Design a protein with these regions (language model features):
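Conserved alpha-helical scaffold segments that buttress catalytic/binding sites
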Residues: 1-216
Length: 216
């Protein structure tokens, strides 16, 4: 949404949407608190949305919220609004992927996922860390998907990250090194540094159609 002159392109409206879905059990209980907690934190830091940004509030997650979210995302993209969706559980991202099935994904997460590997368009992987499922790894190599480890990105090794022209950006916060994000779920020592992630994503020449953040 930033033009070559450095000014925001007001034709692209940013719509921030919270989806406070909750897990039934396990270490991610409390995920529903993330959207409002992030809003509170940004207010304390006196961080405001850009002029072309609007806060759409939180989606009502009672009942069949996934169908409602899918319809809303499709509508927003069709009217040239870029939805920035804050989960909630990883199910939130799954709905976004279903709503926009023909778009490639840039996925920043430590472990590769079957559903992302099996999409029609190749996924770009940022910050892979640890042992990957062998069958998933075979597909990544067979399809020549672009990938990088957290260490490669942090050490700025000579790797080429070719961004698709249009894509969905999915950031799962478990990709961040535990030392920089102690409140996130999932131990990831040796994960990517926050400033590295911002730098790498910011340098990608890509028209983001939707951004989804999970794992908060």
């Amino acid at each position: 949404v930033i033009s070559n002159s450095g000014e925001a392109d007001l034709l692209d409206v940013l719509g921030v949407l919270g989806v406070p879905s909750e897990v039934d059990k396990g270490s991610r209980i409390g995920a529903s608190l993330a959207p409002d907690a992030l809003r509170k934190m940004t207010q304390q830091l006196d961080t405001k949305l850009p002029a072309n940004g609007i806060d759409l509030g939180n989606l009502d997650v009672l009942g069949d919220w996934s169908s409602s979210l899918m319809e809303l995302i499709s509508h927003l993209v069709n009217v040239d609004v870029i939805p920035i969706v804050i989960g909630g559980t990883s199910d939130v991202a799954n709905v976004i992927l279903q709503a926009l099935p023909d778009l490639p994904v840039v996925a920043s997460m430590p472990l590769a996922r079957h559903d992302l590997v099996e999409r029609t368009e190749n996924t770009v992987w940022l910050g892979l860390n640890g042992e990957q499922p062998i069958e998933v790894w075979d597909q990544i190599n067979t399809r020549n998907m672009v990938w990088s480890t957290a260490r490669q990105l942090d050490e700025q090794e000579a790797i080429t990250i070719k961004a698709p022209k249009n894509a969905i950006l999915w950031i799962d916060m478990s990709v961040i090194d535990l030392g920089h994000a102690a409140g996130t779920i999932g131990l990831n020592p040796g994960g990517i540094k926050p400033e590295t992630l911002v730098s790498v994503v910011g340098a990608m020449d890509c028209n983001w159609k939707s951004i989804v953040i999970t794992g908060l």
